[in-house]
Amino acid sequence: MSWRLVYASTVGTSHISADLPCQDACQMQIAWLNDQQPLLSVFVADGAGSVSQGGEGAMLAVNEAMAYMSQKVQGGELGLNDVLATNMVLTIRQRLFAEAEAKELAVRDFACTFLGLISSPDGTLIMQIGDGGVVVDLGHGLQLPLTPMAGEYANMTHFITDEDAVSRLETFTSTGRAHKVAAFTDGIQRLALNMLDNSPHVPFFTPFFNGLAAATQEQLDLLPELLKQFLSSPAVNERTDDDKTLALALWAE
C-alpha cells in the first residue's frame, strides 16, 4: 500500500509568444508520521501574469508550504484543520513579504494563487485561495469540494498576497484518507471541470488514474515526462493558452 504520484507544469503558448517563463509551481511529497503512516502533501500555485514576480511568488509559496509541513511532521503536532491552513497561509505571506522587502518591491508583485491538500489515514484537508481546483475521491467518486474563486471582474481571481487573503481562504476537511487526488491551476480548469456546475469532468481524469494504477515502477519513472508532453500537446493548447499544472496522486492498495 502506497501513494503513486506524478506532477508537471508547462508554459502556456501566450507566455511563449511573450517570451515569458512558466509562472506555475507545484510541490508533492510523502512524509512518514510517527506511526509509520504516510502523509501526502500537495501544493500548487499560479503566479499572477499581471505582476513582475508572479512566478517567483508561486515557487516561494509552494516551497514555504512544504517546509512548514516538514516542520509540523518533525514536531509531531499535526491537526488537519482550519488552524493548520490559516497558519500555513500566514507563514507563506510572511515569506513573500520578506522577499518583497529584500528586493524593494511591493508584495503584490509576488501575487499568486495557492491550493493545497494534505491527507493522512486520519483525515484530509483541502485549502484554497484563488482559482484552479483540487478534485478528490474520498471513497464516493470524484468531487470538487471547493469552487474555484472568481474575482470582481472577468479573468480576475484572489491571491495569497491580497490584504484579505486570510479571510478569503476556504477549507474543506474530511475524515479518512483520500483515494485519488488531482490538483490543477486554472490553465486546465476548462478541461478538468464541467464549467456549468463546477463538477469534475470524470472522463478527463480517468485515463490518468488508470495509468497510475497500472504502471510498473519503470513506467512510473516515465510518467512526469509523459504528463508534460500531454500538457504541451496541441489538443490541450487549442483549449488554453495559459500555463498548466496538474498534480495527481493515487492510493494504491
Curated annotation (Swiss-Prot):
GO MF annotation list: phosphatase activity; protein serine/threonine phosphatase activity
Reactions catalysed: O-phospho-L-seryl-[protein] + H2O = L-seryl-[protein] + phosphate; O-phospho-L-threonyl-[protein] + H2O = L-threonyl-[protein] + phosphate
Pfam families (alphabetical): PP2C_2 (PF13672)
InterPro entries with a match to the protein in the record: PPM-type-like_dom_sf
Domain of life: Bacteria
UniProt KW keywords: Hydrolase, Manganese, Phosphoprotein, Protein phosphatase
Protein activity control: Activity dramatically decreases in the presence of the general protein phosphatase inhibitor sodium phosphate. Slightly inhibited by sodium fluoride. Activity decreases in the presence of the metal chelator EDTA.
Cofactor: Mn(2+)
This enzyme's EC code(s): 3.1.3.16
Recorded coiled-coil stretches: none
Posttranslational mods: Phosphorylated by YegI.
Function (record text): PP2C-like phosphatase that can dephosphorylate YegI. In vitro, can hydrolyze p-nitrophenyl phosphate (pNPP) to p-nitrophenol.
UniProt name for this protein: Serine/threonine-protein phosphatase 3
Organism phylogeny: Bacteria, Pseudomonadati, Pseudomonadota, Gammaproteobacteria, Enterobacterales
